[in-house]
């Protein structure tokens, strides 16, 4: 059995022993005492993190794909029931020398839910990639994704295995002219109908079998990749051809699809993550625990809105923010599991019906003897008067002309006004609305944590969109006396993502403080530490971010003594 772990495992155990040796006698161990368990935990975390990154990018690519297909020229459009899909994965394997490697797999194909048309698939005797609308789309989408979205994976020197699958129907072939576009072939290895074969084809003899026709369709895709995809010109590529002749006739049996494996794509990243784990740099790993259900008066609503409808971009890592914060609420702050509700990709109505209404019922049932926490990670926007609004998932901008895009990417320079601005804001949640929902119910405390930008910039630092302003300066909203709001940034500044940590910067540093204080930290200490550490790290990355707070008018300095643990 091969070793599934990485080379630093013995160093890891030495570090573990050193930590245990110097730890106070009453402290909980920070790591498992078993080397095997410790290595398993690290390995599991690394693979999970890599898959998380891959899945996030896959979602964004598929959003872009659908938008690009919509904007194809009429002559190249696919049927409404033809669906192109990119699937990506992280796969552990071994090299020919028996060494472990962590590979990236890019798979693009399409499904057809109709059988009456011929334009999407190859004409009966055709083999060139551009004679099939579906093959043309797959080739061009592959080029766009590899060259524009996956440049950090398809890097110089990496080995790839490119499997091209091409098929024919059962129509009998007597003779098809071959023009020699891809050269003459003698005894070339391929798989045909699940058997290893050797295929020959040249201009003199032409095409006389379905095996030859399917093979040339695959060679056509290869010719496109070699000529058009720049990233593949710097990798070491091995091509495999899988061909098939179906036993029925029809255009939907004449197809091509593509799978690319980038060998060792994540090996370096895995080593870097392992080193960081040894230094306890990840808040998602080794989450501390206190007595279960000890914080029984606290209830929390977590809103993690990561996925948005195209052409709006997703909010990077918002889902992970919500999931990990849930772990800290339950394990580190001792909030009972049933007291925490997580909403993923929730729209305005769902947030109210499933979240706010749930909290209001609890407050009434407990006669206000509860502490309320509401967390939001997602997009935000300011109205013409700079009032901040949360922008939930599911927001529909399809009827707004400014959002029309040819390549699936959000157009730059969008500034909405008038009816278009009103259409967007009507689907959002203003701070006044959010806090006003609790106007008729009183709790011991309300704490809001908002990790969002309101200035027209995404977490990634890329341009989002804006609403034309009627005033020149941002002014923080006023809230009632029992409310404290932690904000990742003021309404005219950007809340960024911390890419290496898979979190928003603000959320990451809140989690870090909860981790190393084990939840025993006041709001004042939390805010001071987050401000200092976040400003330092974000400035090193060239994207300075400073959090802010909004405090109820009559709280004065008393807010600073609040904590998340309320026994």
Regions found by a protein language model. Give the residues of each.
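N-terminal targeting leaders that direct proteins to extracytoplasmic destinations
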Residues: 21, 27-107, 271, 277-282
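Acidic/histidine-rich, surface-exposed loop or edge segments in extracytoplasmic proteins
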Residues: 102-129, 201-203, 300-311, 336-338
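Periplasmic OmpA/Pal-like peptidoglycan-binding modules at the C-termini of bacterial envelope proteins
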Residues: 98-100, 155-158, 172-286
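Periplasmic peptidoglycan-binding/anchoring modules of Gram-negative envelope and division proteins
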Residues: 121-193, 226
């Amino acid at each position: 059995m091969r070793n599934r772990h990485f080379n630093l495992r013995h160093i890891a155990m030495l570090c573990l022993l050193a930590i245990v040796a110097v730890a106070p006698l009453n402290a909980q161990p920070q790591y498992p005492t078993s080397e095997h368990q410790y290595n398993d935990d690290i390995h599991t975390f690394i693979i999970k993190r890599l898959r998380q990154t891959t899945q996030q990018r896959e979602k964004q690519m598929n959003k872009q794909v659908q938008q690009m297909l919509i904007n194809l020229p009429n002559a190249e459009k696919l049927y409404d029931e033809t669906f192109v899909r990119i699937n990506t994965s992280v796969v552990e394997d071994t090299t020919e020398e028996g060494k472990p490697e962590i590979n990236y797999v890019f798979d693009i194909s399409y499904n057809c839910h109709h059988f009456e048309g011929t334009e999407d698939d190859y004409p009966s005797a055709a083999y060139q990639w551009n004679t099939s609308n579906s093959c043309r789309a797959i080739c061009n989408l592959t080029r766009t994704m590899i060259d524009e979205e996956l440049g950090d994976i398809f890097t110089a020197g990496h080995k790839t295995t490119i499997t091209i699958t091409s098929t024919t129907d059962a129509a009998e072939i007597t003779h098809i002219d071959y023009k020699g576009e891809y050269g003459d072939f003698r005894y070339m290895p391929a798989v045909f109908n699940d058997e290893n074969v050797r295929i020959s084809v040249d201009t003199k003899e032409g095409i006389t079998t379905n095996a030859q026709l399917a093979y040339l369709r695959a060679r056509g895709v290869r010719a496109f990749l070699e000529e058009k995809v720049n990233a593949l010109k710097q990798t070491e590529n091995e091509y495999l051809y899988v061909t098939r002749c179906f036993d029925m006739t029809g255009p939907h049996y004449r197809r091509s699809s593509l799978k690319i494996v980038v060998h060792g794509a994540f090996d370096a990243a895995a080593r870097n993550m392992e080193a960081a784990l040894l230094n306890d740099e990840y808040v998602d790993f080794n989450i501390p625990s206190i007595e279960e259900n000890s914080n029984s008066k606290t209830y929390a609503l977590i809103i993690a809105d990561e996925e948005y409808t195209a052409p709006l971009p997703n909010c990077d890592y918002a889902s992970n923010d919500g999931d990990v914060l849930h772990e800290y609420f339950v394990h580190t702050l001792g909030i009972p599991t049933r007291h925490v509700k997580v909403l993923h990709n929730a729209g305005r109505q769902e947030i109210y019906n499933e979240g706010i209404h749930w909290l209001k019922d609890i407050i009434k049932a407990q006669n206000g003897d509860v502490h309320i926490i509401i967390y939001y990670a997602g997009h935000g926007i300011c109205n013409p008067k700079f009032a901040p609004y949360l922008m939930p998932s599911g927001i529909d901008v399809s009827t707004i002309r400014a959002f029309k895009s040819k390549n699936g990417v959000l157009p730059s320079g969008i500034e909405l006004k008038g009816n278009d601005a009103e259409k967007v804001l009507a689907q959002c949640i203003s701070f006044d609305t959010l806090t006003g929902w609790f106007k008729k119910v009183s709790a011991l405390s309300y704490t809001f944590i908002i990790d969002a930008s309101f200035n027209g910039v995404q977490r990634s630092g890329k341009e989002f969109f804006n609403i034309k302003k009627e005033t020149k300066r941002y002014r923080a909203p006023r809230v009632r006396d029992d409310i404290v709001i932690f904000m990742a940034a003021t309404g005219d500044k950007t809340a960024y993502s911390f890419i290496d940590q898979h979190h928003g910067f603000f959320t990451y540093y809140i989690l870090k403080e909860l981790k190393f204080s084990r939840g025993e930290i006041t709001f004042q200490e939390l805010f001071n530490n987050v401000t200092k550490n976040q400003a330092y790290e974000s400035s090193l990355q060239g994207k300075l971010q400073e959090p802010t707070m909004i405090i109820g008018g009559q709280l004065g300095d008393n807010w600073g003594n609040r904590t998340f643990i309320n026994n």
